[in-house]
C-alpha cells in the first residue's frame, strides 16, 4: 500500500469526570491527503478535509474512532495540540489481501 508519511499521532478521546481526556497513540506509515474546497453556497466558507489511509500493519492495537484527534506527524505532546483535527468518520477495509487491508479516516 502506498504511504507518504512516516507516521502520525492519534489521540484517543475518553471521558473522565465528565471532561474529555486523551490517550496518545503513535501510528506507523500512513497515506495523508489534504483536500481544500471552496463552498459554492452563500457563505463561501472553505471546506477543508483530510483523508488518511492507514495500512493494517500501521495499526497497533487500536482502531481510530469518531471524535478522536489526529496530527499528521509523530509528536510527543501528551494532549492534542491546537493543530490536531477531529476524526469525522472511520471505514475499515479489513478483508482481501493482507497487503491491501487498511482503515480510511476522514477528519476536519
Question: Residue ranges of each PLM-predicted region?
Answer:
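Short, conserved turn/kink motifs that form compact alpha/beta structural patches or helix kinks used as
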Residues: 20-108
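Active-site-proximal polar cores
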Residues: 1-26
Amino acid at each position: 500500500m502506498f504511504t507518504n508519511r512516516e507516521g502520525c499521532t492519534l489521540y484517543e478521546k475518553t471521558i473522565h469526570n465528565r471532561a474529555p481526556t486523551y490517550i496518545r497513540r503513535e501510528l506507523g506509515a500512513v497515506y495523508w491527503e489534504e483536500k481544500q474546497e471552496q463552498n459554492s453556497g452563500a457563505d463561501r466558507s472553505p471546506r477543508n478535509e483530510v483523508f488518511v489511509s492507514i495500512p493494517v500493519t500501521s495499526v497497533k492495537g487500536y482502531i481510530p474512532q469518531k471524535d478522536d484527534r489526529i496530527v499528521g506527524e509523530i509528536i510527543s505532546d501528551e494532549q492534542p495540540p491546537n493543530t490536531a483535527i477531529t476524526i469525522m468518520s472511520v471505514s475499515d477495509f479489513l478483508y482481501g489481501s493482507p497487503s491491501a487491508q487498511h482503515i480510511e479516516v476522514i477528519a476536519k
